[in-house]
């Protein structure tokens, strides 16, 4: 089956077609104009979705996966695992245009012009091959990929060092004195709830009732 260039002036038959307003990149929605919805509330699971690209998730460190859902069904089309998030995002754009046409929401506004898209109604395998082919066009050179990874690691190391220096400026004082003072307050409060002990030499006869008379004065 022949390919169709959306926005490039070619139809599925391979013959040139007039370029009109429908072929403009502005006719497609993008994640910047219609960002994907996020579930509200707190989540206990680890978030794997890319914060910007639609249809892209992180699988392992340095790996990104992409899958798309059929417009009128629950079935998903697995597009593959890619080295960069941009490669996975480009694969998503190809599959989205092949499945939804002008109603597709793209990650990049220039995808209709730069990517080769199967015609509407193409099978899953054909869409997957086109998505992988589009992703390979944006594979970074080995040196560029390593440089980007090293730059990210350097930024993380600098942030860690800055945090360590920040906490080093604020010394941590021992809490022994404060704990001792608090224990004294606790002992005082406990002592107020206990009856004081009798004084030395004090008799307990006053607590008993006696019927006898006692002479208070003696002459």
From Swiss-Prot:
It is found in: Nucleus. This is Dehydration-responsive element-binding protein 1E. CDD domains: AP2 (cd00018). SMART domains: AP2. Keywords: Activator, DNA-binding, Nucleus, Stress response, Transcription, Transcription regulation. Residues 52-109 bind DNA. Belongs to the AP2/ERF transcription factor family. ERF subfamily. The gene is DREB1E. Disulfide bonds: none annotated. Pfam families: AP2 (PF00847). GO terms for cellular component: nucleus. GO terms for molecular function: DNA binding; DNA-binding transcription factor activity. InterPro entries: AP2/ERF_dom, AP2/ERF_dom_sf, DNA-bd_dom_sf, DRE1A-I. Residues 1-19 have a biased composition (Low complexity). Coiled coil: none annotated. The lineage of its organism: Eukaryota, Viridiplantae, Streptophyta, Embryophyta, Tracheophyta. Transcriptional activator that binds specifically to the DNA sequence 5'-[AG]CCGAC-3'. Binding to the C-repeat/DRE element mediates high salinity- and dehydration-inducible transcription. It comes from Oryza sativa subsp. indica (Rice). Transmembrane segments: none annotated. Residues 1-44 are annotated as: Disordered.
């Amino acid at each position: 089956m022949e390919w169709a260039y959306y926005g490039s002036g070619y139809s599925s038959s391979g013959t040139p077609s007039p370029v009109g307003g429908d072929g403009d990149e502005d006719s497609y929605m993008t994640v910047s104009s219609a960002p994907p919805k996020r579930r509200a509330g707190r989540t206990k699971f680890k978030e794997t979705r890319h914060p910007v690209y639609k249809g892209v998730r992180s699988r392992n460190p340095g790996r990104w996966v992409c899958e798309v859902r059929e417009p009128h069904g629950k079935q998903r089309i697995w597009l593959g695992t890619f080295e960069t998030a941009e490669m996975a995002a480009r694969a998503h754009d190809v599959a989205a245009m092949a499945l939804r046409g002008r109603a597709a929401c793209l990650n990049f506004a220039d995808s209709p012009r730069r990517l080769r898209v199967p015609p509407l109604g193409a099978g899953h395998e054909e869409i997957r091959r086109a998505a992988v082919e589009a992703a390979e066009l944006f594979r970074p050179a080995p040196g560029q990929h390593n440089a980007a990874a090293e730059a990210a690691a350097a930024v993380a190391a600098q942030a860690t060092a800055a945090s360590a220096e920040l906490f080093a400026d604020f010394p941590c004082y021992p809490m022994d004195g404060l704990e001792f003072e608090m224990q004294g307050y606790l002992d005082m409060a406990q002592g107020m709830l206990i009856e004081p002990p009798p004084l030395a030499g004090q008799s307990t006869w006053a607590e008993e009732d006696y019927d006898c008379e006692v002479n208070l004065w003696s002459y």
